[in-house]
UniProtKB/Swiss-Prot annotation:
Protein name: Replicative DNA helicase DnaB
Gene (name only): dnaB
Top-level taxonomic group: Bacteria
InterPro entries to which the protein is assigned, alphabetical: AAA+_ATPase, DNA_heli_DnaB-like_N_sf, DNA_helicase_DnaB, DNA_helicase_DnaB-like_C, DNA_helicase_DnaB-like_N, DNA_helicase_N/primase_C, P-loop_NTPase
Any one cellular-component term (Gene Ontology): primosome complex
Entry EC no(s): 5.6.2.3
UniProt family annotation: Belongs to the helicase family. DnaB subfamily.
Domain SF4 helicase: 200-467
GO biological process: DNA replication, synthesis of primer
Organism (species): Escherichia coli O6:H1 (strain CFT073 / ATCC 700928 / UPEC)
Length: 471
């Protein structure tokens, strides 16, 4: 407490002397911090915004304090000053003055808080205790559900636990958010420009895609970007995304993280061996390999084992919370991540929103964008396309073809579609050619890039054919 003497000292002493009361587990809280916040607001109304960014009424432990803070918010909203007299009058009109301790308690709050200088720190304490209490409440709820499952399976109980914890994590205020002075923004911007100027990068300022023409369009996959790769079945979206991962892993030392919700890790590894070794993936899958194939694969394995920077998580039905926590762990252990790839977005789930698919997808895409910003890493998420494009004469995808497209299109920084004409036209003149259609790029041009598709190797390569109009 900021004052010279604590509030309710007699009550505290009685509790300490009573062994039965002392043995009770009291939820974590700080009466002194709460009183200092309330008293500080009465002393300096200008600190309201600092406090309101950190706490809400429910963060206060005692009911009287919740009522007082709520009434302060009402006064602030109406443009009225917050002081001993106005607050007492307002509480009196609401019939709550006696329930909060009367005029005497409000006067004590004001008197025993000498200044509002440290009110932000006190508000942080109040919020911290509130989060811990909420965690305890959720833990008790989960325990009760375990003792009395009411027909729910262990999977259902895990979903319940995850969703409750997820809500707590999402509700926490991020102190790094909010307005920044232009001086701070300029400093960071100039530092980034100087870094780019001093480092030779051939125009690639992000993660190198491994594809020259794509790098020219995008300058690489940028940190903090959510990148959507979408295509109809058989176009090679998993292959393309894996090639991006492989190229990133080979061209840098930072770890790359794959969340494969559809395909087991062994199949992912077989595809990578085929791609990097340029050995027919059918021969790898069936084990029909000759000496040259084995030599190529052994060489690739040696490189992969030397770098050891590819991580694969093939857990199914992952939630945004699980993806975030696992990515954080890898980033913490290795000092960062080079690239995250998720195959595919629609297989993720949010148990609390499972009844509304549109809201669920919106939460997933929002969470992936937040993850990209938090870890300052490009996140590549694969997405399905609506079947409706099959009815068009020109089956090249557009942004509106994204399944549950609204939120995905809004959150994405870069959207790339894969189109191979030979999938629809057997005698196409474009056999072996893939079009990477950039449908959206927040900080760059849209257009089309051609790549060569080598399906037998599960690989896209740089296109070396004649020039074409990509617009």
């Amino acid at each position: 407490m900021a004052g010279n003497r604590p509030f309710n000292k007699q009550q505290t002493d009685n509790r300490e002397r009573d062994p039965q009361v002392a043995g009770l587990k009291v939820p974590p809280h700080s009466i002194e911090a709460e009183q200092s916040v309330l008293g500080g607001l009465m002393l300096d109304n200008e600190r309201w915004d600092d406090v309101a960014e950190r706490v809400v009424a429910d963060d206060f432990y005692t009911r009287p304090h919740r009522h007082i803070f709520t009434e302060m918010a009402r006064l602030q909203e109406s443009g009225s000053p917050i002081d001993l007299i106005t607050l007492a009058e307002s509480l009196e009109r609401q019939g709550q003055l006696d329930s909060v301790g009367g005029f005497a308690y409000l006067a004590e709050l004001s008197k025993n808080t000498p200044s509002a200088a440290n009110i932000s720190a006190y508000a942080d304490i109040v919020r911290e205790r509130a989060v811990v209490r909420e965690m305890i409440s959720v833990a008790n709820e989960i325990a009760e559900a375990g003792f009395d499952p009411q027909g729910r399976t262990s999977e259902d109980l895990l979903d319940l636990a995850e969703s409750r914890v997820f809500k707590i994590a999402e509700s926490r205020a991020n102190k790094d958010e909010g307005p920044k002075n232009i001086a701070d923004v300029l400093d960071a911007t100039v530092a980034r420009i100087e870094q780019l100027f001093q480092q030779p990068h051939d125009g690639v300022t992000g993660v190198n895609t491994g594809y020259d023409d794509l790098n020219k369009k995008t300058a690489g996959l940028q940190p903090s970007d959510l990148i959507i790769v979408a295509a109809r079945p058989s176009m090679g979206k998993t292959t393309f995304a894996m090639n991006l991962v492989e190229n990133a892993a080979m061209l840098q030392d930072k770890p790359v993280l794959i969340f494969s919700l559809e395909m087991p890790s062994e199949q992912i590894m077989m595809r990578s061996l085929a791609s990097l070794s340029r050995v027919d993936q059918t021969k790898i899958r069936t084990g029909q390999l000759d000496d040259e194939d084995w030599a190529r694969i052994s060489g690739t394995m040696g490189i992969l084992l030397e770098k050891r920077n590819i991580y694969i998580d093939d857990s199914s039905g992952l939630t945004p919370t699980e993806v975030r926590s696992r990515a954080r762990r890898i980033a913490r252990e290795h000092g960062g991540i080079g690239l995250i790839m998720i195959d595919y977005l629609q297989l993720m789930r949010v148990p609390a929103l499972s009844d509304n698919r549109t809201l669920e997808i919106a939460e997933i895409s929002r969470s992936l964008k937040a993850l990209a910003k938090e870890l300052n890493v490009p996140v590549v998420a694969l997405s399905q396309l609506n079947r409706s494009l099959e009815q068009r004469a020109d089956k090249r995808p557009v942004n509106s073809d994204l399944r549950e497209s609204g939120s995905i299109e809004q959150d994405a920084d870069l959207i790339m579609f894969i189109y191979r004409d030979e999938v629809y036209h057997e005698n196409s003149d474009l056999k072996g050619i893939a079009e990477i259609i950039i449908g959206k790029q927040r900080n760059g041009p849209i257009g089309t890039v051609r790549l060569t598709f080598n399906g037998q190797w599960s690989r896209f390569d740089n296109y070396a054919g004649p020039q074409y109009d990509d617009e």
